[in-house]
A protein has these predicted regions:
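Glycine-rich, histidine-containing beta strand-loop boundary motifs that form or position
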Residues: 102-104, 116-119, 155, 183, ...
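Radical SAM enzyme core and accessory elements
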Residues: 1-80, 86-88, 340-508
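Conserved alpha-helical substructure of the radical SAM core
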Residues: 30-51, 59-62, 66-183, 187-193, ...
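Short glycine-enriched, charge-decorated loop/helix-capping segments at active-site entrances
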Residues: 119-127, 220-225, 293-294
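Broad gene-expression machinery/nucleic-acid interaction feature
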Residues: 33, 99, 205, 247, ...
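Radical SAM/AdoMet-radical enzyme domain recognition
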Residues: 134-152, 161-282
């Protein structure tokens, strides 16, 4: 029986043509599936969301018109073929850049079996020059109406570049407030001086690959079994240099590390002086399989939420909210402070997050609870919507009173004072102080060609800045554009080695 039904568009996994897609509920297993048919390559089925009840909870509450953005005022491409084939961003895109990504190299000192973006597989080196990267940063900062202020340097392995500290400094000089480095951590574990250079240059956060606490996990996902000690050494070195913002980034694979989520969260809590977030990324799929087989292999956002519920016993699946939940906070603060804020107008099915408040006990013991135990987050969001609409009518004093009336309802004094600081100061530093007292848990399910939903793509807020002068959404770039762009701006491995007098796995 199929009770919930919705229509969108997708692409054929084989020829990439745009095709209609149906999203529907199968009551037999409480799962949301998708099906799409290419006139040339036939029918494809996949799991869209692993829990129909959670899907409808997110979709019905956070897919309203007021959660849909208007995109950028200065798109970099025209509509010719239609989404996703004009990505640049084009006028069809509905969300501005909340996080920019720049791949500074495709070289890497690992050869992960699951990776799609390193030189050893590609047989060429993609490594934009300092000048090209400076132009990409400028491209992000020229976005209108929101000048992107958060940037991730990624790869490949970005720490293979000796000039990464200078690139970070360049981003800070251009007005980027938050600069994070996406890394496997090997160089940060081995070379504390280099780690310190990154911090001194202005690195805000280490976005650390962290798939679990057992070497068997890394053997399967990363092809080597000596990485747990390396991850722990990065944590240790972070303390030594005063870096107190590490995100543990979990590539989640069914049957490999899906039983590790509780222990990873506990590890974050034990190291909450430096760990600010655990971000979970369900692995993308490759290859064609039947519907039943895809259900066995595919792990989706609600699957992970239920695993966390089971493994922690403290964090319920209903303690999470979709990634666009902060939208009213941005709109309300914009009206109160008279300045722009990033608008989280992503599709509610793209991800979810919650926060946990950690309290220290005796003898290095910690207790924690999700933020929903201290604050009615949905009422909090509604208060900010009221603040926004009252301010629109010119009633700012009344809007501020609405906010003040809500503060006594917050059960935690710490959270109450921190939220008061965010509201009254309304700047990035105040928000950072709030984050320093809690751990964020996040999950983002990046798409592959099998579950590709154009409705999601058009609302993506994570955009690659590229040397051709365009911005492309994360899932569009990785599925449709990466190979072509990298090849266009690459050199052969032999040419790179001759120029640098180094192997491609060495620091240069």
């Amino acid at each position: 029986m199929k009770t919930f039904e919705l229509y969108s568009s997708s692409i054929c996994p084989i020829c990439q043509r745009r095709i209609p897609m149906r999203i529907y509920e199968d009551e037999k297993d409480n799962v949301i599936y998708l099906e799409k048919t290419c006139p040339e390559h036939g029918k494809f089925e996949d799991v869209y969301w692993g829990d129909a009840e959670l899907y409808k909870y997110f979709f019905e509450n956070w897919n309203h018109a007021k959660y849909i953005g208007e995109g950028v005022e200065n798109p970099h491409s025209k509509i010719v073929k239609g989404c996703p084939f004009d990505c640049g961003l084009c006028p069809q895109h509905k969300t501005h850049t909340v996080l920019g990504i720049i791949d500074v190299t495709n070289r890497c000192n690992m050869a992960c079996p699951i990776c799609f973006a390193y030189a050893g597989k590609a047989n060429y080196v993609y490594e934009p020059s300092f000048g090209q990267i400076a132009e990409m940063i400028k491209l992000l900062r020229e976005n209108s109406p929101w000048q992107c202020n958060a940037l991730q340097f990624s790869g490949g392995e970005p720490t293979l570049r000796n000039d990464l500290p200078e690139l970070i400094a360049e981003a800070k000089k251009a007005g980027i407030t938050h600069v994070e480095v996406n890394t496997n951590g090997i160089r940060l574990a081995e070379d504390i001086k280099y780690f310190k250079k990154l911090k001194v240059a202005g690195m805000s956060t280490v976005y650390l690959q962290f798939d679990g606490l057992r070497e068997e996990v890394y053997k399967k996902l990363r092809g080597r079994g000596d990485l747990v000690s390396i991850k722990k050494k990065v944590i240790e070195n972070a303390r030594k240099i005063g870096c107190n913002s590490i995100v543990l980034v979990v590539t989640l694979a069914k049957g490999i590390n899906d039983n590790e989520l509780g222990s990873i969260i506990n590890f974050a809590i034990e190291n909450h002086d430096v760990v600010r977030c655990v971000n979970i990324q369900p692995i993308s799929m490759a290859g064609r399989a039947k519907k039943e087989e895809m259900r066995r292999l595919r792990i989706t956002i609600p699957d992970a939420l239920k695993l966390i519920e089971e493994q922690t016993g403290k964090i319920s699946r209903y303690d999470w909210r979709p990634v666009n939940w902060p939208m009213p906070i941005a709109k309300g603060m914009e009206m109160l402070k008279g300045e722009a804020y990033p608008e989280f107008t992503m599709h509610p099915m793209c991800g979810a997050s919650t926060f946990i408040l950690v309290e220290e006990g005796n003898k290095n013991s910690y207790s924690y609870a999700p933020i929903t135990k201290y604050i009615d987050v949905d009422h909090f969001a509604e208060v900010f919507w009221r603040v926004y609409y009252l301010s629109l009518r010119g009633e700012k004093t009344k809007a501020k009173l609405e906010m003040l009336k809500f503060l006594p309802d917050i059960k935690s004094k710490l959270i109450r004072e921190l939220i008061k600081g965010v509201v009254t100061k309304g700047n990035y530093e105040a928000l950072g102080k709030l984050m320093n007292n809690v751990i964020m848990l996040g999950i983002m399910h990046f798409q592959d060609v099998w579950n590709f939903d154009i409705a999601r793509v058009q609302r993506c807020a994570i955009h690659y800045a590229l040397p051709d002068g365009k911005l492309r959404s994360f899932c569009t770039y990785n599925n449709l554009y990466r190979d072509e762009i990298e090849k266009r701006y690459s050199v052969s491995i032999e040419e790179w080695k001759a120029r640098k007098k180094k192997e491609i796995t060495e620091y240069a």
